[in-house]
């Protein structure tokens, strides 16, 4: 595929799967976990990836919340590093534009890490 075909394929893939992506994001938002404790997020994301045909290796580098997912063979090789941790004290109800915690003092997502 040429560059424009690749671009169209990617946009179509995102559009075709937007409900799945949004549900995963919302699930991670509703279950905020601090750094190195993101077990729910890891299971959510790796399950989604495995169901989409990715090969997933969990516990990478001795970290139970780290994983590598691979799809296909050959080139191009595309990689990225992502975070899905919440921050302490940022509990926030979804769709609220003012401080409105689910639980006062609890962790929450304030940096978009749930959007992976």
List each language-model region with its residue ranges.
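Acidic/His- and Gly-rich active-site-bordering loop/insert found
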Residues: 3-109
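Active-site alpha-helical elements of protease catalytic centers
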Residues: 110-116
């Amino acid at each position: 595929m040429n560059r424009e075909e690749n671009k169209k394929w990617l946009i179509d893939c995102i559009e075709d799967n937007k409900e799945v992506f949004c549900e995963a994001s919302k699930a991670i938002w509703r279950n905020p976990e601090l750094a190195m404790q993101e077990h729910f997020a890891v299971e959510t994301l790796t399950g989604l990836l495995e169901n989409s045909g990715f090969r997933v290796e969990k516990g990478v580098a001795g970290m139970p919340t780290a994983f590598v997912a691979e799809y296909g063979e050959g080139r191009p090789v595309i990689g990225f590093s992502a975070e899905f941790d919440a921050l302490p004290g940022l509990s926030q109800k979804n769709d609220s534009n003012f401080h409105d915690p689910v639980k006062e003092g609890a962790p929450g997502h304030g940096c978009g890490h749930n959007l992976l």
